[in-house]
Amino acid sequence: MKPLLFPITVILVLAAPAVLRAQAATDSGTFVLLHARDTVALEQFSRGPTKLVGTLALRNAKRTSERYSAVIAPDATLPLVEVTVREGVDSGPRKAKVVQRARVIFKQDSAAVDEVGDAGLMTRVFGTETGAVPYLNLSFALLEQAVRRARLTPGGSKISFFNLGGGQTIAATLSPLGADSVKLDIGDIRFHLRVDSAGRVLGGRIPVQDVVVQRK
């Protein structure tokens, strides 16, 4: 599968009507990624009981943005995820250029990828691990999904990620790091994440990259 962006080495309301309870179950926010105090990316996301959507906007020369939409299963896996990569920004009648679209369907230990790019439509099937979580470089909303998945899995210190930027499956380890934090080792990259009791990521760091993540 053509890389989507970068390789892996980057770095409740009580007694409320049903509609209000549904709204309370929806969580949204923005992750701000900083390197040496400069903003390198912004990720806006919304997570409901059955769907996770977000846009990761990179502060690069091409003004790349990646919009994703994923189905959330009861076990916190994401059996279907769609990603659209665009370059530039919408300006009046001129729209940002769509450079790639991809859809990934997970079933047991395989991932079927439909990709539309410059070469047309391409379909590939990759081997992976059952329950693997999609990994999109710099997406902390997807890392949060992995934390939520781990908390629902017996002995959930081990997590598998399916790299959307290459099709590899990467083993990861989740370990406690103080009362309100965890460390997540994905390959040789370590993430420090501040989390709450529900598994929401409140902020974090990538120490080796000198990247700080704030949630707003």
What are the residue ranges of the model-derived segments?
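Solvent-exposed helix/loop surface patches that form functional interfaces
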Residues: 39, 92-186, 205
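Short, exposed beta-strand-loop hairpins at the edges of beta-sheets
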Residues: 191-208
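Bacterial N-terminal signal peptides
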Residues: 7-17
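Solvent-exposed loop/turn segments connecting transmembrane beta-strands
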Residues: 59-64, 188-191, 211
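Boundary of Sec targeting at the N-terminus
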Residues: 23-25, 38
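N-terminal mature ectodomain segment of secretory-pathway/periplasmic proteins
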Residues: 34-113, 199
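Positively charged n-region of N-terminal signal peptides that target proteins for export
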Residues: 1-5
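Sec/Tat signal peptide C-region and signal peptidase I cleavage site
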Residues: 18-22
